[in-house]
Swiss-Prot record:
<keyword id="KW-0137">Centromere</keyword>
<keyword id="KW-0507">mRNA processing</keyword>
<dbReference type="GO" id="GO:0006397">
    <property type="term" value="P:mRNA processing"/>
</dbReference>
<comment type="function">
    <text>The SPT4-SPT5 complex mediates both activation and inhibition of transcription elongation, and plays a role in pre-mRNA processing. This complex seems to be important for the stability of the RNA polymerase II elongation machinery on the chromatin template but not for the inherent ability of this machinery to translocate down the gene.</text>
</comment>
<keyword id="KW-0804">Transcription</keyword>
<dbReference type="GO" id="GO:0032044">
    <property type="term" value="C:DSIF complex"/>
</dbReference>
<comment type="subunit">
    <text>Component of the SPT4-SPT5 complex. Interacts with RNA polymerase II.</text>
</comment>
<dbReference type="InterPro" id="IPR022800">
    <property type="entry name" value="Spt4/RpoE2_Znf"/>
</dbReference>
<protein>
    <recommendedName>
        <fullName>Transcription elongation factor SPT4</fullName>
    </recommendedName>
</protein>
<dbReference type="InterPro" id="IPR009287">
    <property type="entry name" value="Spt4"/>
</dbReference>
<keyword id="KW-0539">Nucleus</keyword>
<dbReference type="GO" id="GO:0140673">
    <property type="term" value="P:transcription elongation-coupled chromatin remodeling"/>
</dbReference>
<dbReference type="GO" id="GO:0006355">
    <property type="term" value="P:regulation of DNA-templated transcription"/>
</dbReference>
<comment type="similarity">
    <text>Belongs to the SPT4 family.</text>
</comment>
<dbReference type="InterPro" id="IPR038510">
    <property type="entry name" value="Spt4_sf"/>
</dbReference>
<dbReference type="InterPro" id="IPR029040">
    <property type="entry name" value="RPABC4/Spt4"/>
</dbReference>
<dbReference type="Pfam" id="PF06093">
    <property type="entry name" value="Spt4"/>
</dbReference>
């Protein structure tokens, strides 16, 4: 993990989790860099409104992944194709309908909420 992932105790209240990939970063980092996994379709960088609607301050548990491709917990949490970092186990909140439609229609990505309300179909 790089030191850029370090969050001081005072910054903990500024942590947010992406509603799609569940990566946990400060709101300032989302503002400066966007989401390292979802930026292509979320466009969070330099967009406070998009950050507010596509990330959540309400999340449970944190997993630190150094090598997601080799981690069984990353596979179980559907994180194995993402960058190393801190990830929430559950993220509360609803992704806006327009973002969800864009994901499914333009990018062919099935959105599965990370709050545990829907389960992935194995079919």
């Amino acid at each position: 993990m790089s030191s850029s992932n370090y969050v001081t105790t005072g910054q903990a209240r500024n942590l947010r989790a992406c509603m799609i990939c569940s990566i946990v970063m400060t709101s300032q980092r989302f503002q400066n860099e966007g989401c390292p996994n979802c930026e292509e379709f979320l466009h969070l960088q330099h967009s406070p409104d998009q950050i507010e609607s596509c990330t959540s301050q309400v999340f449970e548990g944190v997993i630190t992944l150094a090598n997601p491709t080799k981690s069984w917990i990353a596979k179980y949490q559907r994180l194995d194709s993402y960058v190393p970092g801190m990830y929430a186990i559950k993220v509360s909140g609803q992704l806006p309908d327009d973002v969800r439609s864009t994901l499914e229609d333009e990018y062919r990505i099935q959105y599965i909420p990370r709050d545990g309300t829907e389960v992935e179909n194995d079919a």
